[in-house]
């Protein structure tokens, strides 16, 4: 059995670490390279970086951050945000990332998933899914709809159907983010995570809502996730990565406990 993973998520704007709630109200909370190094030393299994700026100038700043991170940490890390082509994927992988995460671009152009997998291998392609709970309907039978642009645009696409499509196209992993739970610290949307995990054979990362280690344990047990993505609870010093992993291990989750 594979160990469950704890993955801190770092949103980067203009080269600085930032954090908001439900994709708004972002504030500067530090240096992403220093934070990545600290999380690596605390025992993070992987790290995810999202570039939440869109300009070409900011992209150059972000790639510099990626290169500096690659010099400081020795665990896998993935990069997302603004990746809309195989050339974009190549740029972040050459900068030192092990994986790329694509979200809105994959919804708009599903072929990008397969193109990326063909070029770099499925293991390098993570598809991020931003999901909104909606009333069940013939169009959205699961009651979970894919949204893009930070949750601002609904796509009329059922999340379960999209997860299966991503697997068929060659994705190596899915990161499932609940828009409703994001930043609330009230716990993950376990029903959503479980539904996706049951629908595909890919590893599923639970995202959105972690407020304490118990929530992370719930995600990888009842939620069926392979990993728990966290942000606020470690960025603001409420818990350390080590505390989270030790709690999960003490309550039955298989964890990598090396520091």
From Swiss-Prot:
It comes from the Bacteria. Pfam families: His_biosynth. It catalyses: 5-[(5-phospho-1-deoxy-D-ribulos-1-ylimino)methylamino]-1-(5-phospho-beta-D-ribosyl)imidazole-4-carboxamide + L-glutamine = D-erythro-1-(imidazol-4-yl)glycerol 3-phosphate + 5-amino-1-(5-phospho-beta-D-ribosyl)imidazole-4-carboxamide + L-glutamate + H(+). Transmembrane segments: none annotated. GO terms for biological process: L-histidine biosynthetic process. Its main location: cytoplasm. The active site is at 11, 130. The keyword Phosphoprotein does not apply. GO terms for molecular function: imidazoleglycerol-phosphate synthase activity; lyase activity. Pathway: Amino-acid biosynthesis; L-histidine biosynthesis; L-histidine from 5-phospho-alpha-D-ribose 1-diphosphate: step 5/9. Keywords: Amino-acid biosynthesis, Cytoplasm, Histidine biosynthesis, Lyase. InterPro entries: Aldolase_TIM, His_biosynth, HisF, IGPS_HisA/HisF, RibuloseP-bd_barrel. It is found in: Cytoplasm. The keyword Nuclease does not apply. GO terms for cellular component: cytoplasm. Belongs to the HisA/HisF family. Heterodimer of HisH and HisF. PANTHER family: IMIDAZOLE GLYCEROL PHOSPHATE SYNTHASE HISHF (PTHR21235:SF2), IMIDAZOLE GLYCEROL PHOSPHATE SYNTHASE SUBUNIT HISF/H IGP SYNTHASE SUBUNIT HISF/H (PTHR21235). IGPS catalyzes the conversion of PRFAR and glutamine to IGP, AICAR and glutamate. The HisF subunit catalyzes the cyclization activity that produces IGP and AICAR from PRFAR using the ammonia provided by the HisH subunit. This is Imidazole glycerol phosphate synthase subunit HisF. It comes from Desulfovibrio desulfuricans (strain ATCC 27774 / DSM 6949 / MB).
């Amino acid at each position: 059995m594979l160990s469950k993973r704890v993955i801190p998520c770092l949103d980067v704007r203009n080269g600085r670490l930032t954090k908001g709630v439900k994709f708004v109200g972002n504030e500067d909370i530090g240096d992403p390279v220093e934070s990545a190094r600290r999380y690596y030393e605390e025992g993070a299994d992987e790290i995810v970086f999202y570039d939440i700026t869109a300009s070409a100038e900011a992209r150059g700043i972000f790639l510099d951050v990626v290169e500096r991170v690659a010099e400081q940490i020795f665990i896998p890390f993935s990069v997302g945000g603004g990746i809309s082509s195989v050339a974009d994927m190549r740029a972040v992988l050459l900068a030192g990332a092990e994986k790329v995460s694509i979200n809105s671009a994959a919804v708009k152009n599903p072929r990008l998933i397969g193109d990326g997998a063909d070029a770099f291998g499925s293991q390098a392609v993570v598809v991020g899914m931003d999901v909104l709970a909606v009333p069940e309907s013939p169009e959205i039978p699961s009651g979970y709809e894919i949204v893009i642009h930070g949750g601002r645009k609904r796509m009329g696409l059922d999340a379960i159907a999209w997860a299966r499509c991503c697997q068929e196209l060659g994705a190596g992993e899915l990161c499932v983010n609940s828009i409703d739970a994001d930043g609330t610290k009230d716990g993950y949307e376990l029903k959503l995570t479980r539904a996706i995990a049951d629908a595909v054979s890919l590893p599923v990362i639970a995202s959105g809502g972690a407020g304490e280690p118990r929530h992370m344990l719930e995600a990888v047990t009842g939620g069926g996730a392979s990993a728990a993505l966290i942000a606020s609870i470690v960025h603001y010093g409420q818990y350390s990565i080590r505390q989270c992993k030790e709690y999960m291990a003490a309550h039955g989750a298989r964890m990598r406990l090396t520091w």
